[in-house]
């Protein structure tokens, strides 16, 4: 997520957004492009400046990008954004430490929406929140997506959230993309052994239905110094000598369903 926004410089490859390679943009071009690309951070406690009020935090991108220079108009925009994310106007001059996690994350969402972006990278946006608040934030984000035509890149380890939220799912293991498909297709036909193990861990809310849990064994390969071959080979129950020596490529096994696994060849 941070590489897409170039908060961390990618070491190789391309990041194509709106037909343009983000990696080739200079500082000034990137500054303009970031109006269309925003980020909602994982931790609502660490991502907000404790020295600034709610209004100052939400107004900051508008000031930095010089989108609204008139202070009164900027404050009107802040109030509008607060209303959109469900924050009461009376909170406008409060500080982050005076608010709970749910309200803090709403501030982060309002800040991300300030410049009317096309894309928002959501880095585990509910994982640090109480379970009772998670659903509220997810429903808010879904409503905003429908109202504003937003595109989310939603990074999470919670597969129940993914099933509820995503149109398309990309599964990664140690930095490698191993399976990608529309949400319904991936949940119905998980193909990569790691994806199958992930989905087997989701509880089934039924006494009649049971799902066999796949327990992975073996040591996790170092992501810094990975061994040759497939990065999942050390834990895969179906791994062959080829898996341990040759890295599989991501390929399409059926329309819109991509898998990086030697075992899918010929399917």
Where are these regions (language model features)?
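Helix-to-loop junction immediately C-terminal to a conserved catalytic motif
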Residues: 5
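Conserved ABC ATPase "signature" region
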Residues: 21, 66, 72-90, 196-200
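Conserved ABC transporter NBD signature motif
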Residues: 13-21, 33
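A short, proline-enriched helix->beta-strand linker immediately N-terminal to the Walker B motif
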Residues: 114-118
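P-loop NTP-binding/switch modules centered on Walker-like glycine-rich loops
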Residues: 121, 125-129, 133-211
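Conserved ABC ATPase signature
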Residues: 95-99, 103
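Short catalytic/signature loops enriched in Gly
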Residues: 182-267
């Amino acid at each position: 997520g941070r590489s897409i926004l170039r908060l961390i410089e990618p070491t190789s490859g391309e990041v194509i957004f709106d037909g343009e390679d983000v990696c080739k943009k200079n500082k000034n071009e990137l500054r303009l492009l970031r109006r269309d690309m925003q980020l909602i951070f994982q931790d609502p406690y660490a991502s907000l400046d404790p020295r600034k009020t709610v209004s100052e935090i939400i107004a900051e991108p508008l000031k930095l990008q010089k989108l609204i220079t008139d202070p009164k108009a900027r404050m009107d925009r802040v109030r509008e954004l607060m209303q959109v994310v469900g924050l009461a106007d009376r909170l406008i001059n409060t500080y982050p430490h005076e608010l709970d996690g749910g309200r803090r994350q709403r501030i982060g969402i309002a800040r991300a929406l300030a410049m009317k972006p096309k894309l928002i990278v959501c880095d585990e946006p509910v994982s640090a929140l109480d379970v009772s608040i998670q659903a509220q934030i997810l429903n808010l984000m879904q409503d905003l997506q429908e109202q504003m035509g937003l595109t989310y890149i939603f990074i999470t380890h919670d597969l129940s959230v993914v099933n509820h939220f995503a149109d398309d799912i990309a599964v990664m293991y140690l930095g490698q993309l191993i399976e990608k498909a529309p949400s319904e297709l991936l949940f119905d036909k998980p193909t990569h052994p790691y994806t199958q193990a992930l989905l087997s861990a989701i509880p089934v809310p039924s006494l009649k239905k049971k799902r066999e849990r796949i327990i992975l064994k073996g040591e996790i390969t170092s992501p810094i110094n990975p061994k040759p071959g497939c990065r999942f080979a050390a834990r895969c129950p179906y791994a062959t000598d080829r898996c341990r020596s040759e890295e599989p490529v991501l390929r399409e096994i059926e329309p819109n369903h991509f898998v990086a696994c030697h075992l899918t060849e010929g399917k």
